[in-house]
Design a protein with these regions (language model features):
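Short, conserved charged micro-motifs
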Residues: 19-24, 76-80, 109-111, 179-187
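Aromatic- and glycine-enriched beta-alpha-beta binding-site module
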Residues: 68-106
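Mixed-charge, glycine-accented linear interaction segment located at domain edges/termini
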Residues: 145-206
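Amphipathic N-proximal alpha-helical interface segments
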Residues: 51-71, 75-79, 148-171
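N-terminal low-complexity, intrinsically disordered segments
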Residues: 1-71
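Short beta-strand-to-loop capping motifs
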Residues: 13-16, 70-73, 103, 171-177
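Aromatic/basic-lined ligand-recognition segments
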Residues: 108-170
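Short glycine-/aliphatic-rich beta-strand segments at the starts of folded cytosolic domains
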Residues: 3-16, 99, 103, 128-135
Length: 206
């Protein structure tokens, strides 16, 4: 697919027992999770039950049942952060990790129809119109995870203010986490981040 664009990437870890109330600038810097020179932006939010921290390098979301690290730049620093943060909360009952990549591509020349329309299906025939858009959900095992790909039609706004028809490709590499192996399995998944990213690029450039 031509002109696909990566618009987001994040790592989300689900578990019971995170303590958002301690996740602040002092905690992150004293724990060596971020450097002393990295500035926490003023629009960051810190409460006992909800934390959202904005920096030029990442956005961090932490709630009692999960945390999510959204990459802005420096993927290697991000991977180190996720591993270090997970260890700081080693008492958490970890349940799953998801590594996620989001892309958009212009839905030109009925691309969504070319990819997903099934002419032999009576359901699809009901949507065989000029205004119809199509998507899909695909899943399979990949390395130590299950890859889930969701494709949805959406719209964007061009610089001139007009709408742009797009397809949103959302890749999720999901791994269940069990007991005493949880931190080891988190590390395995995080170490596969680059392989997951490359595999998504391969699919999007096919």
């Amino acid at each position: 697919m031509k002109n696909s664009e990566l618009i987001g990437r994040n790592i989300k870890i689900i578990g019971d027992g995170f303590n958002p109330g301690i996740v602040n600038e002092f905690f992150l810097k004293s724990s060596k999770l971020i450097g002393d020179d990295l500035q926490i932006k003023s629009n960051s939010i810190t409460t006992p039950q909800f934390v959202q921290i904005f920096t030029d390098q990442f956005v961090l979301l932490c709630l009692p049942d999960h945390f999510q690290y959204n990459f802005i730049k420096d993927e290697n620093a991000g991977k180190r952060f996720v591993l270090g943060f997970s260890k700081k909360f080693s008492v958490v009952n970890y349940r799953a990790i998801g590594i996620n990549f989001d892309y958009v591509v212009k839905d030109e020349k009925e691309l969504s129809k070319e990819l997903f329309f099934k002419s032999e299906s009576p359901i699809f025939r009901e949507f065989n119109t000029e205004s119809s858009k199509f998507g899909g959900f695909l899943t399979k095992k990949y390395r130590n995870s299950i890859i889930n790909l969701t494709v949805k039609p959406t719209t964007g706004i061009k610089p001139d203010g007009n709408k742009d028809d797009l397809l949103h490709f959302s890749f999720n590499f999901h791994t269940e986490l069990l007991g005493i192996k949880a931190l080891d399995d988190i590390k395995k998944s995080v170490m596969d981040f680059d392989k997951f990213h490359s595999y998504c690029d391969k699919i999007m450039n096919a």
